[in-house]
C-alpha cells in the first residue's frame, strides 16, 4: 500500500490534493484514480470506494460548510423513526456544489441567514459535522411538511414534546425566523389535545 492509499484509509477514506503539495504526490493520486483505488468526489477531493458506502461519510470534506439537516438531524435527536434516505445537507442558496451521482447526499439550498442559527457541532462515527439542533429540526419538519409528508411532521412534533430537554421558547423564536410560527402553533395545539 503506497503512502497515498495509507493516508486515505487512515483518514476515513477521504483525502484532498491540498494535503499533498508535491507534484509527484498529485501524480500518485491520479494514478490511484485510474487504477480504481480512488474515486474523484469533487475537485481536489478523492475517496476510497469502500468509504463512500459506509453508514457515515465525512460530510465536511465533501460539502465544506454544509449543515446536516432534516432526516439525519431527526434521527440523531431521536425525533423520527424514518430511516434517512440519504445525507441531507443544507448549503447557501447561491452556492454551487458539483456532486457525483454515486454519493448518497441530497443538497438543500437555504438562504444565508437561515444557515446562521440553530446549528450545533456534533461528532458522529469519528467525524465532526455541523447539524441543526433539536428545535431547528422541528421547525424544518414543519417548513418541509408537504415534501416529507404530514405523518413524519406529526411524528417529529410528538416526539419533541415528549423530550425532557425541549426548549419551547427557542422553538418559538426559530419558528418566527423561519416564518412557520402559525403553522407550528396549530400542530402543537393538535398534539397537546
Task: Describe the function of each predicted region.
Residues 1-15:
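Short amphipathic alpha-helical interface segments
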Residues 11-19, 28, 33, 45-193:
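Nucleic-acid-binding surface
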Residues 36-43:
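A short, conserved structural fragment
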Residues 22:
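Alpha-helical residues within the helix-turn-helix
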Amino acid at each position: 500500500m503506497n503512502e497515498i492509499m495509507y493516508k486515505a484509509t487512515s483518514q476515513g477514506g477521504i483525502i484532498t490534493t491540498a494535503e499533498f503539495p508535491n507534484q509527484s504526490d498529485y501524480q500518485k493520486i491520479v494514478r490511484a484514480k485510474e487504477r480504481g483505488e480512488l474515486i474523484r468526489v469533487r475537485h481536489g477531493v478523492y475517496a476510497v470506494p469502500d468509504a463512500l458506502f459506509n453508514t457515515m461519510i465525512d460530510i465536511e470534506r465533501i460539502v465544506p460548510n454544509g449543515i446536516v439537516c432534516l432526516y439525519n438531524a431527526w434521527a440523531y435527536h431521536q425525533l423520527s423513526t424514518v430511516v434517512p434516505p440519504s445525507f441531507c445537507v443544507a448549503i447557501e442558496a447561491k452556492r454551487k456544489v458539483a456532486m457525483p451521482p454515486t454519493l448518497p447526499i441530497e443538497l438543500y439550498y437555504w438562504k444565508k441567514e437561515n444557515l446562521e442559527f440553530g446549528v450545533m457541532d456534533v461528532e458522529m462515527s469519528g467525524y465532526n459535522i455541523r447539524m441543526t439542533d433539536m428545535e431547528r429540526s422541528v421547525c424544518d419538519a414543519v417548513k418541509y411538511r408537504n415534501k416529507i409528508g404530514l405523518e413524519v411532521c406529526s411524528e417529529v412534533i410528538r416526539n419533541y414534546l415528549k423530550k425532557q430537554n425541549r426548549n419551547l421558547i427557542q422553538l418559538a423564536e426559530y419558528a418566527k425566523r423561519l416564518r412557520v410560527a402559525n403553522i407550528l402553533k396549530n400542530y402543537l395545539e393538535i398534539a397537546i389535545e
